[in-house]
Amino acid sequence: FLPAIAGILSQLF
């Protein structure tokens, strides 16, 4: 799981 994707999900949710 890429940290970059986690950052985007944090902003969406």
From Swiss-Prot:
Any idea where this protein resides? Secreted
Residue numbers carrying Phenylalanine amide: 13
GO annotation (BP), single: killing of cells of another organism
**Where the protein is mainly located, per its record?**
secreted
Q: Work out whether the entry's keyword set contains DNA-binding.
A: no
Keywords annotated in UniProt: Amidation, Amphibian defense peptide, Cytolysis, Hemolysis, Secreted
Annotated Gene Ontology cellular component terms: extracellular region
Q: Does the keyword Secreted apply?
A: yes
Q: What does this protein do?
A: Shows hemolytic activity.
Question: Where does the entry say this protein is expressed, by tissue?
Answer: Expressed by the skin glands.
The name of this protein is: Hemolytic protein A1
The top of its lineage is:
Eukaryota, Metazoa, Chordata, Craniata, Vertebrata
Q: Which top-level group of life is the source organism from?
A: Eukaryota
